[in-house]
Amino acid sequence: MGRRRAPGGGSLGRVLIRQQTQRSRSHRHTDSWLHTSELNDGYDWGRLNLQSVTEQSSLEDFLATAELAGTEFVAEKLNIKFVPPEARTGLLSFEESQRIKKLHEENRQFLCIPRRPNWDRKTSPEELKQAEKDNFLKWRRQLVRLEEEQKLILTPFERNLDFWRQLWRVIERSDIVVQIVDARNPLLFRCEDLECYVKEIDAAKENVILINKADLLTAEQRFAWAVHFEKEGVKVIFWSALAETDHLNGDLKEEVDSVAGDTNKTESESSSLDANEIPHRDLISLSEESASDSGDSKYEDCQEDEEEDWQTCSEEDSVPEEEEGCNADSETQNRKNAENQQVNNDSYLVSKQELLELFKKLHTGKKVKDGQLTVGLVGYPNVGKSSTINTIMGNKKVSVSATPGHTKHFQTLYVEPGLCLCDCPGLVMPSFVSTKAEMICNGILPIDQMRDHVPPVSLVCQNIPRRVLEVTYGINIIKPREDEDPYRPPTSEELLTAYGCMRGFMTAHGQPDQPRSARYILKDYVGGKLLYCHPPPGKDPVAFQHQHQQLLESKVKGGELRLQPGKGRKAKQIENVVDKTFFHQENVRALTKGVQAVMGYKPGHGLVTAAAASAENVPGKPWKKHGNRNKKEKSRRLYKHLDV
């Protein structure tokens, strides 16, 4: 055994020394919370202990800049600004949207695409690449200057020069340049400067706008867009790659083969194709059937006349195009104006064979490659360029994906001898938008990569009525409070909460998973399940949405909106905490003293019903004093929850 240590404080000295050492070490390596002031009245011995600063946070950078400028900060009081609830949605008010639209119209001429510099056979590849880089850098600086000076928001345009080189090659080798746009918002996906650039390269080239996904539009909506582009002198063709693919794979293939064999069909047969040949998507099938009864008869004569004018126009313009060729700029402009006056657009959905025949009739002049008509397909990502090629070819020649920007290189495919299709990679061209939420809802930005889900879902709630959302998903969205507008659109939180509870999307804490629900709803909006079609300029956006009312009417006729007796008759409403507390039964209570009930009230129990009173009066144990419970409880303890 070891030597016994002395009881008591034998190690007290060591403990004190150890604590003092630890205290000195802690003060040496940690900062103190003591307030000090730098007087700068002595010699700075730490002037040589410099630290290199290469990166700073935004706050540190701001404070360092303010210190260098000698700026002093003074607290401002009584500078109160009320932030409305709509500010968190990320959407613009009506006044702000009108102001931004005015700025868009004033600066529309600055929206351009990069040009390829002039070159000839004497230009070396190195000189051409350097000239392309210089022009591209100049173009990017111009757009950045436009954003900074005018405070405008541009779409995230393509910043890779190799993609623009693909576009230049497609335009140079194409006789017809087809811009494919989305039928729900054609003006956003249309690039007017691209049409000018095509004419700058060769005046004999033709510009055409192919409105894809046109099966989402009704006959009246297609007619409105046809008239709008006809006034601007732009040739448009209404087309649906998905609907045509379903048609070719369906039971009506024999009818399509007969149409392909007979190219000289009458106008009545071409108009009947619009109503009977194209199978529409699930959401639009009911609305198209009701719209065809009321609208197709109204536009039959117009469509027949427009088809005759289209064929006459293309045949008459072929002769002067062959004779004139590439003339001076003044003659080109005069010829272009003459063509614009004779443009007539049809509003019916064309089939595959009709689309190819229109391509052959549009360009009859001198071709880039003798004996071959080359059609270049350009446009934004995910608008259906590759799907259009696969539909025309009859099988999968180009890979297709729902993610924007899937096609990386242009490729040429021969449909038949003398007709070649050229698929260009999707390019996001510079365009004006009000918010980033519009780019997400229009499919320009990927939904899975969004950071904030509130602005795009709020935009969906503004465009799609409350009743359509409830019918589409089978949910009940909570109603506004009594002091709010009963017709206001639902907020993003109300929609996502109802959708998440219905689908069972919950977080770890038992709350509805709103970001996950937002991705599903936004994908339905981009895919067309939640349909909103932008109208032409000058049209009322609310009156232009024919599908919403037709969808509700079809659901009512089908019996899907019938409510079960005693269920779903009254939707939930946002509770007002003040009203609920004020009118609660606990607040209405008589304060009495004594054991026996007075006028139906007992101390600590409130109102006593007749059934309860009769049960207590049963002579079982009369010696029990049940009324002494909470007899001496003070009122301020009973009603402490009412104290402020």
UniProtKB/Swiss-Prot annotation:
Modified sites of kind Phosphoserine: 93, 97
BP term (GO), one: protein transport
Species this chain originates from: Mus musculus
Source taxonomy: Eukaryota, Metazoa, Chordata, Craniata, Vertebrata
GO cellular component: Cajal body; cytosol; endoplasmic reticulum
Reactions accelerated catalytically: GTP + H2O = GDP + phosphate + H(+)
Role: Functions as a GTPase. May act by mediating the release of NMD3 from the 60S ribosomal subunit after export into the cytoplasm during the 60S ribosomal subunit maturation.
Entry keyword Transmembrane: no
Protein name per Swiss-Prot or TrEMBL: Large subunit GTPase 1 homolog
Similarity comment text for this entry: Belongs to the TRAFAC class YlqF/YawG GTPase family. LSG1 subfamily.
Residue ranges constituting the CP-type G domain according to the UniProt record: 164-430
Positions annotated to bind GTP: 212-215, 379-386, 423-426
Compositional bias ranges of the Basic residues kind: 622-644
Main location: cytoplasm
The UniProt record lists the keyword Lipid biosynthesis: no
